[in-house]
Design a protein with these regions (language model features):
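N-terminal organelle transit peptides
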Residues: 1-2
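Nucleic acid-binding interface residues in structured DNA/RNA-binding domains
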Residues: 5-117
Length: 117
């Protein structure tokens, strides 16, 4: 399901305050976003959450669902050599072990693009 849901929070949650708009994205939307990250660029998960939210008219993206959906997006696209997940995670990110990704390959791709570890 490739849709965004925006909710106004009654109570603060994580780094999102009460009254702010919180985006609940999807694996598909996160995949689309990662595909568009330019070569040589790195985006932290926090920055990814903020940018996804702003594009959807929200203040921030839910950190819990972002983690889940990021893992799903990487899992669904990990065999696509054009899917640049290494621009969002480094070889030390917990999802690397969960999905049995090649740490050395991630490191090499980041070095090749000039992305610091």
């Amino acid at each position: 399901m490739s849709r965004n849901i925006v909710k106004i929070l009654d109570k603060g949650f994580s780094d999102i305050s009460a009254g702010e708009k919180m985006l609940i994205s999807s694996p598909e939307k996160i995949s689309e976003f990662i595909f568009k990250i330019p070569k040589g660029s790195y985006l932290s998960i926090k920055s990814l959450r903020r940018e996804l939210a702003l594009k959807a008219g929200a203040d921030n993206t839910c950190p819990v669902t972002t983690g889940i959906f990021l893992r799903m997006a990487i899992e669904q696209n990990k065999d696509d050599v054009k899917f640049p997940y290494w621009r969002v995670i480094d070889e030390k990110h917990p999802v690397v072990k969960k999905l049995k990704l090649d740490e050395n390959q991630i490191k090499k791709r980041r070095v090749d693009e000039g992305i610091p570890s």
